[in-house]
Amino acid sequence: MIDKKVIVIGAGLAGSEAAWQVANAGVPVKLVEMRPFKSTPAHHTGEFGELVCSNSFGALNPDRAAGLLQKELRIFKSLIIQTADKFAVPAGGALAVDRSKFSMALTEALSSHPLIEIERFEQLDLPRKEKITILATGPLTSDELSYKIQAFTGIDACHFFDAASPIIYGDSIDQEIVFKASRYDKGDPAYLNCPMDKNNYIHFRNQLIEGEQANLKDFEKESANFFEACLPIEEIARRGVDTMRFGPLKSIGLWNPKWGDLFDRENRLKKRPYAIVQLRKEDLEGKLLNMVGFQTNLKWSEQKRIFRMIPGLEKAEFVRFGVMHRNTFLESPNLLLPTLQFMKRNNLFAAGQITGTEGYAAAAAGGLLAGINASLLAKGKKTVSFPKESMIGSLINFISNKNQILSNQKKNKFQPMPASFGLVPELTKRIKDKRLRYKAYQERSTEALNDFKNKLDYCFEKDHLLSKIY
């Protein structure tokens, strides 16, 4: 028999949101947080929802992906976004918060809720099968619990480091310069290729070597063996003038028919590029493209500057920059349903960064959905998934859809993803102007979510509780 009391493990953004949604649906919650009795290398307090990196939730304008995600969360009265709005600080067009007041307010809100029981200890194992549980332990999940999650999901389904190449929008690439081809013409032309001559390559390599690095935290530096197994592109460049050319930038076997006869040796030697950067589809439609082999520890501003030196990428727009850091996350497409339930245990949910989403608002969105569904399950009702036309729905669909991991990609190549318009379904009518297209995405999302919200057998009217807190 299922215990109707929901357990939420982790009181970060996702866990805090999940606990709030469950409790406000009238279902009792036990919220487990190990801090401050056991901290992480990145946290400094025992407050809930402590922001350890930036204090920004991203752009406010709903014509931007991050802004639309925030707008959708406001529709569902997200605790995280309402608290962020309450303690916002001036940040131009972004939503940034006073970190201390933000986390203290979250802690007070959750601690004073009559249906939320707070327990401070390190969860060492997954709760028993009869317990409805939301796993929201984040990228710095404790070692002991990580081992138990790994045992439950399978050794290849739980990752402990994030080595991700940049992802760029396909429509920002110069199609006059790049060309489609697979190496040695094997199969369909699965890659877009950016050819470099010798001068391009030498200049590019020099800039990579001189580029400013992001600072690794001490606990990340201790994991040097990881970086040896998956070297940053700038480290490959340092190892020799031609090292990249015989690695991720090798040009052999790639040919553009515009260059003439491949089998004419003289022509081939004359026209063959000195090096080639390859771009691979990140989604089935090819709206998002991954820079193959470009995991990097360069600062984001440097990535933008240096990678735009690649022919064809002069005006590239980045969905996500490359990262190399400690990050516990699941191989979610092989584990989770669009409801955020585990396929092999339907009363166990996952939410937040551990599912492979990136960003504060995305973590809150995962907590929102997991909380709604855990409360529905506790009441004996059917769980739900958000419409794909919404930013929340498209992001959750990406991390829970096996088809998003393309057949031409190697096993376990799923990488965390932020909110992006590249994830949402195409409009029925094509709109060339980007601003108008993004506005249309926003309008479609709002309509779909309002309809979805009206149909949900769930109470969202909680203003009386918020007013007591603030």
UniProtKB/Swiss-Prot annotation:
The keyword NADP applies. It is found in: Cytoplasm. Its cofactor is FAD. One of its GO terms (biological process) is tRNA methylation. Its EC number is 2.1.1.74. The keyword 4Fe-4S does not apply. It comes from the Bacteria. PANTHER family: GLUCOSE INHIBITED DIVISION PROTEIN A, METHYLENETETRAHYDROFOLATE--TRNA-(URACIL-5-)-METHYLTRANSFERASE TRMFO. This is Methylenetetrahydrofolate--tRNA-(uracil-5-)-methyltransferase TrmFO. It comes from Prochlorococcus marinus (strain MIT 9215). The lineage of its organism: Bacteria, Bacillati, Cyanobacteriota, Cyanophyceae, Synechococcales. The gene is trmFO.
